[in-house]
Swiss-Prot record:
Positions with biased composition (Basic and acidic residues): 103-126, 185-196
Keyword Zinc-finger annotated: yes
UniProt keyword annotations, A-Z: DNA-binding, Metal-binding, Mitochondrion, Nucleus, Phosphoprotein, Zinc, Zinc-finger
Organism, scientific name: Schizosaccharomyces pombe (strain 972 / ATCC 24843) (Fission yeast)
InterPro entries: Znf_PARP, Znf_PARP_sf
Zinc finger (PARP-type): 8-99
Main location: nucleus
Protein name: PARP-type zinc finger-containing protein C2A9.07c
Acidic residues: bias regions: 175-184, 197-215
GO cellular component: mitochondrion; nucleus
Length: 246
């Protein structure tokens, strides 16, 4: 079937289980007996037909199929000769000639999308949410989920931002007892107390000791023998010449 039609086929739907792959109808189910257009898909081990309503067939698909079959739709399009209704056959040929499906077929598919959306809303409102008590928990759940997602997005990434270490705060000691206050005051008085005469005596003793040490050193130096002075020679009287070797 795929070989004869080169991967394209038209037929009346045998069941109502197939879902339309087009977007005009909002991917609604193709009803039994509705005209549908199929594309054969061969992906390795899997081979299948992808169906869409005739009103969901786009201008691009019609143009590509007509180009591939070189305008011979009657003999090349698979399933065309199996259609017993001449009105349906004429509709197909007219679409390939004008480059788009009839407006009524496209409008019918748009209505399917609108009806499907309204039916879905009706089931949600009347089927699942029949009372205000059931609506409120779901609304609260949506709000809490949204709030959690916002909080999660606001948390900084620990991998990219280093943690800052807090420096320890200085400890402050509070003296509440009078005894501790007096001890602190006495310590300050001792630190600021001026030096007395006794301390001066101690300094004088240290100075005297240092003077004694220096005197001892000087006596030792004075005990060393002094060099005798060179005797002066009067060269004029002796008649000898002056020489440094003497």
């Amino acid at each position: 079937m795929a070989e004869s039609g080169a991967g394209y086929r038209v037929e009346l739907a045998k069941t109502g289980r197939a879902e339309c792959k087009g977007t005009v109808c909002g991917r609604s189910k193709i009803g039994k007996g509705d005209l549908r257009f199929g594309t054969f898909v061969d992906v390795g081990k899997f081979q299948s037909w992808k169906w869409r309503h005739w009103g969901c067939v786009t201008e691009r698909v019609l143009r590509n199929v007509n180009k591939k079959f070189e305008g011979d739709i009657k003999n090349c399009l698979d399933g065309f000769n199996e259609l017993n209704d001449p009105i349906v056959q004429e509709k197909i040929l007219r679409a390939f000639e004008q480059g788009h499906v009839d407006e009524e077929d496209e409008e019918r598919c748009r209505k399917m999308a609108s009806d499907a959306s309204e039916e879905k809303d009706r089931k949600i409102e009347e089927g699942e949410l029949t009372s205000e008590e059931e609506k409120e928990p779901i609304q609260d759940l949506r709000k809490s989920h949204k709030r959690k997602s916002v909080e999660k997005s606001s948390v900084p990434n620990k991998k990219h931002k280093a943690e800052r270490k807090r420096s320890p705060s200085p400890k402050i000691e509070i003296l509440e007892d009078d005894e501790e206050i007096e001890d602190v005051a006495s310590d300050k008085d001792e630190e600021e107390k001026p030096w007395s005469g006794d301390e001066e005596d101690d300094d004088e003793l240290v100075v005297k000791d240092s003077e004694d040490e220096t005197e001892g050193v000087s006596t030792i130096a004075s005990q060393r023998p002094r060099r005798s002075a060179r005797r002066k020679v009067d060269y004029a009287e002796s008649g000898n010449e002056y020489s440094d070797s003497d």
